[in-house]
């Protein structure tokens, strides 16, 4: 029973689809709806398969930089299978919340911030264990590091001088190191200073009465007097008193100049009501993450202003009321919920009584169960025997997984063994809405084929950026020098076989010294049409003897300077070969 009891703060699996992997979430709240059902407010975590390839490359680059900084080579000691399974354990934290039915919970798991001091094998050895190091924002598609930095160095810390010996004097000039703002040995008594501060508060209250914006924010006299009693008014009055040599008359004259009384306002008064509401909303969403609050809610405010306002806001009655309200809500909310073991998965292939099981719940599409020894093997571990089989992938592919690999697929979002089809599989595209297009793309991805454009605007893939490949002089020279190694015609027939550039570069380096003096042969260029016409006029070709017809059958013919080629189809006996069409026979005859 304890295994099926879920509490606030637990990391759990959620099932939103019978064929897709589980969602990994953290329970923040458990709320009971009006219908009596229990809903869980959860924090979202994302897998590698849920984000784009561009962000995956950034995440791998970040992991590589961390590995280089720590000077560890743990990744090099891992096998291909371990590296493949380690990617399934990586998650990306987000600040996104959602509400899901509590009945969709399928089990507990553990998620922790990546600990650089531990070996990555510790995450593979533990079941249902995941780690994260980056924060993913699904709205703007960005990745950020979820940890602070230790600011060490002279830029952030003071240089500690060496300890002075007994009787040794400090040669530093203290006036340059410190600024004196108050003298405790002043000629004024404490009572006189307190009376001066009362006058300063009265001046601040009168200044707020004259200021239009302050009178709107503090409509009553009590609120104006409370605002005038804040620290900024007292600090300004004490600083004024010190700068005027503790002369009360001159200090009061500075507080009340000719233009009107001096008004000192802090961040609590500078912020408007709408800005205060935005701050409370951001604080509810992000907590005390002031950088995110400034970036998403208050970009026109400085970080210093936001932090100063936060600590002043904690001294107000509104903060105390919200704290009591949250405590009362927490007492009334559910602390835990019991979710019984759910019904079997619909993708389970039933072989009882010879009845076929539905594949992926498709209507009218059935999968004929075969003998495990004669049927398809598991798509992950290639096992032929299992106590239970599950349909996996598109219905028409009739792929299946054994019970062990199916549980691994649901929990970790991938197949156990690294396969070529999974390496070449494209990430899921949430923009594709046509189910036929989705099944076609998944079918091609499972077989390791690149997805091609079908011509439909719905399935059209974004075109890549156009580029121009400019061949250098040395590349052209290498094509002639390294013909035997390059074999351009054979390489053109096998476009997916890579060319050994190292061998070509080595041969080019060996033969470049011998052929450096010989010039590069230029290709023969075709002469312009005007030159050819002039040559034919000067050297006309001999006309063959042709039997002339009778005058009655003669038809007027027009002379042409160049005969147009006849493109009509020839008979089988009169068909020309490839060399004749390309003019190779005339060269051989000459």
Swiss-Prot record:
Subcellular location per UniProt equals: Nucleus; Cytoplasm
One GO cellular component, as annotated? cytoplasm
Q: Where is the BAH domain?
A: 4-147
Modified residue annotations for Phosphoserine: 429, 518
Give the boundaries of each GATA-type zinc finger.
378-402
Key words, A-Z = Cytoplasm, DNA-binding, Metal-binding, Nucleus, Phosphoprotein, Zinc, Zinc-finger
**Primary place of residence?**
nucleus
Q: Which residues form the SANT domain?
A: 266-318
Give residue ranges for domain ELM2.
148-259
Pfam families in the record, alphabetically? BAH, ELM2, GATA, MTA_R1, Myb_DNA-binding
Instruction: Spell out the family assignment given in the record's similarity comment.
Output: Belongs to the metastasis-associated protein family.
How this chain assembles, per its entry, is: Component of the nucleosome remodeling and deacetylase (NuRD) repressor complex, composed of core proteins MTA1, MTA2, MTA3, RBBP4, RBBP7, HDAC1, HDAC2, MBD2, MBD3, and peripherally associated proteins CDK2AP1, CDK2AP2, GATAD2A, GATAD2B, CHD3, CHD4 and CHD5. The exact stoichiometry of the NuRD complex is unknown, and some subunits such as MBD2 and MBD3, GATAD2A and GATAD2B, and CHD3, CHD4 and CHD5 define mutually exclusive NuRD complexes. Interacts with BCL6. Interacts with NACC2. Interacts with PWWP2B.
Q: What's this protein's name?
A: Metastasis-associated protein MTA3
Task: State the organism of origin.
Answer: Bos taurus (Bovine)
Q: Which gene encodes it?
A: MTA3
């Amino acid at each position: 029973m304890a295994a099926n009891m879920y509490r606030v703060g637990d990391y759990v699996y959620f099932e939103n689809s019978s064929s897709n992997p589980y969602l990994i979430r953290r329970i923040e709240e458990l709320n009971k709806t009006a219908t009596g059902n229990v809903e869980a407010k959860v924090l979202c975590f994302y897998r590698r398969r849920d984000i784009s390839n561009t962000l995956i490359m950034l995440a791998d680059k970040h992991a590589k930089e961390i590995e280089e900084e720590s000077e560890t080579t743990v990744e090099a000691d891992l096998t291909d299978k371990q590296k493949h399974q380690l990617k399934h354990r990586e998650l990306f934290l987000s600040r996104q919340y959602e509400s899901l039915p509590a009945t969709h919970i399928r089990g507990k798991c553990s998620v922790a911030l990546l600990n650089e001091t531990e070996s990555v094998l510790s995450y593979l050895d533990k079941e249902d264990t995941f780690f994260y190091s980056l924060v993913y924002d699904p709205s703007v598609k960005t990745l950020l590091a979820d940890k602070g930095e230790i600011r060490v160095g002279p830029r952030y810390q003071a240089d500690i001088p060496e300890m002075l010996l007994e009787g040794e004097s400090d040669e530093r000039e203290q006036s340059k190191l410190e600024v004196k703002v108050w003298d405790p040995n002043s000629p004024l008594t404490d009572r006189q200073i307190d009376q001066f501060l009362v006058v300063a508060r009265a001046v601040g209250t009168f200044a707020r009465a004259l200021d239009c914006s302050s009178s709107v924010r503090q409509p009553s006299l009590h609120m104006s007097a409370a605002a005038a009693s804040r620290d900024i008014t007292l600090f300004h009055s004490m600083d004024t008193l010190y700068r005027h040599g503790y002369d009360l008359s001159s200090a009061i004259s500075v507080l009340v100049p000719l233009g009107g009384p001096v008004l000192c306002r802090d961040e609590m008064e500078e912020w408007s009501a709408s800005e205060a509401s935005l701050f409370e909303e951001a604080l509810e969403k992000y907590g005390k993450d002031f950088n995110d609050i400034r970036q998403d809610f208050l970009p026109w405010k400085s970080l210093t202003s936001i932090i100063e306002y936060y600590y002043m806001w904690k001294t107000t009655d509104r903060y105390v009321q919200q704290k009591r309200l949250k405590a009362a809500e927490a007492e009334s909310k559910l602390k835990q919920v019991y979710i019984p073991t759910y019904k079997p998965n619909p993708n389970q292939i039933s072989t009882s009584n010879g009845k076929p099981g539905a594949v992926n719940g498709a209507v009218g599409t059935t999968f004929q169960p075969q003998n495990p020894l004669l049927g398809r093997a598991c798509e992950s571990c290639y096992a032929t025997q299992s106590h239970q089989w599950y349909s996996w992938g598109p219905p028409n592919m009739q792929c299946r997984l054994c019970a062990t690999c199916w549980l691994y697929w649901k929990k970790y979002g991938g197949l156990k063994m690294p396969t070529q089809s999974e390496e070449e599989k494209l990430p899921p595209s949430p923009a594709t809405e046509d189910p036929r297009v989705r099944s076609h793309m998944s079918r091609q991805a499972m077989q390791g084929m690149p997805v091609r454009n079908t011509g439909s605007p719905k399935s059209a893939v974004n075109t890549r950026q156009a580029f121009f490949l400019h061949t250098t002089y040395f590349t052209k020279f290498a094509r002639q020098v390294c013909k035997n190694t390059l074999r351009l015609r054979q390489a053109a027939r096998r476009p997916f076989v890579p060319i050994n550039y190292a061998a070509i570069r080595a041969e080019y380096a060996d033969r470049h010294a011998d052929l450096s003096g010989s010039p590069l042969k230029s290709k023969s260029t075709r002469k312009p049409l005007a030159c050819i016409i002039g040559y034919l006029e000067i050297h006309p070709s001999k006309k063959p003897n042709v039997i002339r017809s009778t005058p009655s059958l003669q038809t007027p013919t027009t002379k042409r300077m160049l005969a147009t080629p006849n493109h009509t189809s020839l008979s089988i006996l009169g068909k020309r070969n490839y060399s004749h069409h390309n003019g190779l026979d005339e060269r051989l005859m000459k």
